[in-house]
């Protein structure tokens, strides 16, 4: 869509996973590499761009873990997958159906959820996606109600900004994977519970 992207590396120390009462134990970190959309500062993180379980006892171990992440990350593939998103779209009726299924997913039995693609957006984030479908200055739907998957993905990542940092990166990756799951279904004309009855 012509949005300027900047390669970005970042991370946080996962204090939420620390046992503050124990003696010295490995420190935990989450590190990512991906792209920042300069239009809106949304992070675009792919599955191979996240290391969310780094446990280290030294700075050298942390450095080694980050270097491993940087080596395994395929930025060309990541860019290609995001570019592919712009070639597929949902009609307004498909979008409405999808939003309804997202809302239903949250209340399904766990056994039923396991049969669907996992979704980590919560109800308030889904509301944000719907609001921004109409009103986002950069990623709203077209006049006829259609929305391409790049725009939808950015609505997900925008809504994800309300997540606490301890699960922000994982939800960001889930948004990327969910969008690509939908694109695969559209491209291959295969069934998808979120898109079809």
Residue locations for each model-derived region?
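Intrinsically disordered, low-complexity regions enriched in serine/threonine
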Residues: 2-197
